[in-house]
């Protein structure tokens, strides 16, 4: 059975830390593929700056030529508010899936819509800082155990980059060299994204 990792996010824009995390998950978790899952309209976030079409184009530009990385457009195709549980339930059943998340997301995982359903269908992998200890809420640990699912650690050194910082730099005409994959930077420049209105 194929082993697929899922990395969700707004990817507004996708940056080098996203790509590095996906590649780390592919290798460390011994996955066959990592699919980047751009949100249509994330329920816990402010409205997105770039259109779905531009975010998809940037993701494709970022992963071109990188074996094992792919894009999953299910949330964008579905549209509306984006809930992880809906994405999970729509997955083909011919693979074993691992949802990749950050330690900050793990801390509030039990507030996600139908989180118990999510853990019945996917394993979890949490990107952790070197030297940190992975701790899940007792109710999450119990639900994973009952579902026969795992919670795995994905050692990952955080990178000093965030999409909001990149958007701010671009709006102010500042340098973003080294923060964006080359194809993403090119798409942003060619389409005038993230410039002040």
Swiss-Prot record:
Keyword Cytoplasm among record annotations: no
UniProtKB keywords: ATP-binding, NAD, Nucleotide-binding, Nucleotidyltransferase, Pyridine nucleotide biosynthesis, Transferase
Gene Ontology terms: biological process: NAD biosynthetic process
Function summary: Catalyzes the reversible adenylation of nicotinate mononucleotide (NaMN) to nicotinic acid adenine dinucleotide (NaAD).
Record EC number: 2.7.7.18
Functional pathway: Cofactor biosynthesis; NAD(+) biosynthesis; deamido-NAD(+) from nicotinate D-ribonucleotide: step 1/1
Organism field: Bordetella avium (strain 197N)
Catalytic activity as recorded in UniProt: nicotinate beta-D-ribonucleotide + ATP + H(+) = deamido-NAD(+) + diphosphate
Transmembrane helix found in the keyword field: no
Listed name of the protein: Probable nicotinate-nucleotide adenylyltransferase
Source organism superkingdom: Bacteria
PANTHER family listed in its UniProt record: NICOTINATE-NUCLEOTIDE ADENYLYLTRANSFERASE-RELATED, PHOSPHOPANTETHEINE ADENYLYLTRANSFERASE
Top EC category: transferase
UniProt GO MF annotations: ATP binding; nicotinate-nucleotide adenylyltransferase activity
Family to which this protein belongs: Belongs to the NadD family.
HAMAP family: NaMN_adenylyltr (MF_00244)
Record-linked InterPro entries: Cyt_trans-like (IPR004821), NadD/NMNAT (IPR005248), Rossmann-like_a/b/a_fold (IPR014729)
